[in-house]
Amino acid sequence: MEKNKIHILVVDDDDRIRDLIKQYLNDNNFMVSSAISSADAKTKLSQFRFDLIVLDVMMPGQSGFELTKEIKNVMNVPIILLTAKGEVES
């Protein structure tokens, strides 16, 4: 891991979206790790320190909202939640 670079964890079950975000962040000189699920993200969070998490809301198993609550109970890291949903449900 390179020192002095902002380390971002990208969590998304969609390979295309995850790879697009990773590529953009890498191109802009950020250090990027990725996870394909909440379980994978928890493993990465136990191994590394992150400065920011970019997290998909709608994932199979544990949602991004549920994972956010868990993360916030144990660490103080900024989280950006993303969704591909185009409509608000009542």
Predicted regions mapped to residue ranges:
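Short hydrophobic/Thr-rich beta-strand motif most characteristic of the beta2 strand and flanking loop
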Residues: 29-37, 44
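Short amphipathic alpha-helix used as the core "switch/output" element in two-component signaling
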Residues: 43, 62-76
